[in-house]
Amino acid sequence: MIVPKHYENLNVLHENTMPHRAYYMPASKDMGSLVHDREKSDRMKLLNGNWKFQFYKSIYDLQEKFYEAGYDTKGFDEIPVPGIWQNYGYDSHQYTNVRYPIPLDPPYVPQENPCGAYVHQFEYKKDSKAPKAYLNFEGVDSCFYVWINGVYVGYSQVAHATSEFDVTDHLKEGTNTLAVLVLKWCDGTYLEDQDKFRMTGIFRDVYLLKRPESVLYDYFITTSIGENGAEIEIRANFLGESNAAENTKIVIRNHEGNTVATGTFKKCDDENFAYKAVLDITAPVLWNPEQPYLYQVLFLSENEVIIDRIGIREIHCEGSVIYINDVKAKFKGVNRHDSDPVTGSAVNMEQIKKDLIMMKQHNFNAVRSSHYPNSPYFYQLCDEYGLFVIAEADNESHGTQTQYLKNSEWENVVEQWNKRIANNPDFIPATMDRTRLCVEREKNRPCIVMWSMGNECGYGCTFEESLKWTKEFDPTRLTTYESAFYQSTDREYDYSNIDVVGRMYPAFSEIDEYMEKNPDKPLLLVEYCHAMGNGPGDLEDYFELIQKYDSLCGGFVWEWCDHAIYKGQAENGKGIYYYGGDHGEEIHDGNFCMDGLVYPDRTPHTGLKEYKNIYRPARVLHYDQGTGDMVLHNYMNYVDLKDYIYLIYEVSVDGEVDCVGQIELDESIPAHEEKTIKLPVSIPDSGKCYLKVSYCLKNNTQILHSDESLGFDEILLKNIDGRNQKTIELLAEMNTDNIFTVEECDRYFTIHVGQENTYRFNRLTGLFESITVKGKELLTRPMELNIWRAPTDNDRKIKLEWMNAHYDQSYARAYETSCITKNGKLHILGTLSVSAPTVQKILDVKSEWIITSDGAIQVKMDVKRDLEFPMLPRFGIRLFLNRDFDNVEYYGIGPEESYVDKRRAGSHGKYDANVLEMHEDYLRPQENGSHTDCDYLILKGQENTFAAAGERTFSFNVSPYTQEELTAKRHSYELQPCGSTVVCLDYVQNGIGSNSCGPELSEQYRLDAEQFNFEIKMIIK
């Protein structure tokens, strides 16, 4: 082997790396903040580009010293840096959530450890004013060895952290050769078991910094706010001569470029820093996510300028309530991985910008860097755009939980889980190192309000030490660590340095229980509302709970984006996206990585639109339509609604806009307060009337444009006849001279309605199997009673019960049917059941079909459920219409899909679409495209019209795909249209929830009543 086995040595985490420091970008002169264009610094040389590359399936296959000066690399391939080697055909992708992809045997990894040899040549010119050279790697997975010009430089690990080497003595004037050996696995792999695709390579920027001999090396900026202004304390360490500190001038400028404070460093008595400066700013403008005001700080020395930014803000807890700038904080957050379907975990600034801008557009104010440090400019952008950040260390050892145990009781699992790593003293140095790499590099970012020690590692001495160091080093921020929740009985644990209790996916009852105990620490939902596929469905309920308790400081939805690998375009034009199991890997977790609010290409899921409106900046708490008094509450943390938004209101009648107006708020409504404003509207006597109040941005921000809608409220208005008038029209019977003729046999009732309509009713199923109008058959398959839906990702647990109950194989069975004519109408009475193979009857149904002389069919069903069975996915009627029924009109909640617990993205109205537009194309096919609270549905074909309406509202789906097709296929590009327009008319569907990883579906959204009735009318023309 050509390298020492540092990769299996817990005592060698780094070799020859520089001490941890804050991130900054030096230059020879004032070149601006260098956030968006750091490569413009004249002291930075970016080494990204195409590098020579050779892949080896095993480190034992690498026999030649490829790093030696003059080594011939003509047999090497080329690969882009930054980049992931799996994306270029080397090795293969693997997605696993909890389980390690290797045996659980720390610190050892498989002997056949894949590796990649990188070689890159670059030019270097010495600078007498900046003779020192530092080589920076911002992200390499999993570990790497470095050589320059054939001479060994050093070794490092921790994939998502910066490794810096002093390479001054290794460089020469002119052409230099950099060689890097990257290994797929190392002992650090056991601490990098995050829920993501396992990707390898140099995936972040590589660059050289030129610096003077004597220089500011590290600094820590903290701010405090007093009655007379703000105090800025800057502690620092210097390299080189002792006069470097006194020769460094500090200048602070405001956003407008005016100098507001100056100072110099003086020696201080501090455990971590040798120098300190204290500067005062009078009448400071504070930083917060809604008004992210940043000052600029310049460190000026003879041969170097460092420019950074300061956000003045103060964080503290009073009891169990978090205050930021003396305001009770509520985190409206989301978890974010570095992920792109083409570039994988190698994401650049533009990709990060797109994510953060979308977050701001959808009313997020916080992001958790799950579960590792991001690129340094991620945090700088959060400073600038206005997002709170929970900065998380690169530490997850969740796979230790899955070790094989005879005793699989949870208490024993936790005890053994903790012993492996979290409570193993051998891992204290590695855990401390990862914590410090996170904290030290980003310590100057005002957006960071909380340090997280990691994710799902269990708890023990490693984290006790890390938390203790963090609180001592940075008492200005809060700490959290969710896995402290997992306690074993082998010892007493120290939780004193955890400020915020973190929990994942708690049920509402658990939150209530925590709050009832009058906790002394805030509760944070570090992960909640699992957004996998069609979901989440419980956002509004969590929002209400977060508002109910001051001690519940908010939460972070899991997660931002679907993780998938783009594989090109299918013949049908759809994108091909691979997830776990699509790459030939044996150990994988399927599509559990497809759990975001946006698709891999950042197209929003309906769940993201749902989130945006639930977390709108204001809400109407009450509206008195008699007086026009409207109580408006400000849900922002800092801004006054008067300065932030204006209102657009509209009154719609049966989906048609009746009046529109605009209101400028002329009175102050401070954050967290409410005020009554006047909004009188005229309301017609008849029709379903809604008042929609939209909240529009008043002025441009750096991210958002004026007039953008930030959300809306919808209020049902009362009038004399509040029914939808089109529905009344559809429900009304048309007077005709048609007479009924019925042909009866053991199997069928064949009903002729006048000369044009013929219906065949199957007496064995109790349902129609043929509807003919003017000789044209409208049904392509018999009608069905339908209780199945293609399981959503959030049905992944309950679907096992559903399939065990054979819901997916259920069908209608009639026991008796009779046909009578009464009052000019034909009545078909039936007693039937919904049954399935191997199990008892699921449902008993009493049905009455009423056919009127105009050919309309009305059905009334009384349903009784056997309580032995689980909740139903849905209940309704499924029809297969000719595919020329392509034009859809409906009145209900749209245009986004809607369900009983996922309906805030849309509003009541009249909508038009074609059938394909009604389909939400989730990459793993599942139930989608439902619309709830509907008054009527109309489908128009080339010659005929089919409509449905009810005295009570109903739910429906219209799709080119069957639920069987959606159930069977693993990818959306595999879906085949069935050749019909599939129409599901539902009493209701079961709720969506977030039970793929979260709590069970709330009771109020379950279709589990013992008895219910369903009534709907179908109009055929």
Question: What are these model-predicted stretches?
Answer:
Residues 87, 92, 99-108, 157, ...:
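An acidic-aromatic loop/edge-strand motif
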Residues 265-282, 655-686:
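Intrinsically disordered, low-complexity Pro/Gly/Ser/Thr-rich segments with frequent PxxP/GP/PP motifs
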Residues 148, 230-266, 629-634, 638-662, ...:
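Beta-strand-rich binding/interaction modules
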Residues 1-39, 96, 151, 190, ...:
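Extended substrate-binding grooves/exosites of carbohydrate-active enzymes
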Residues 172-175, 235-316, 689-727:
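Extended acidic/polar, glycine-enriched regions
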Residues 87-89, 184, 288, 680-687, ...:
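Beta-strand/loop-rich accessory regions of lumenal/periplasmic or secreted enzymes
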Residues 3-15, 33, 37-38, 52-56, ...:
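Accessory beta-strand-rich segments of carbohydrate-active enzymes
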Residues 194-216, 572-631, 635-656, 682-727, ...:
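Catalytic cores of secreted or luminal carbohydrate-active enzymes
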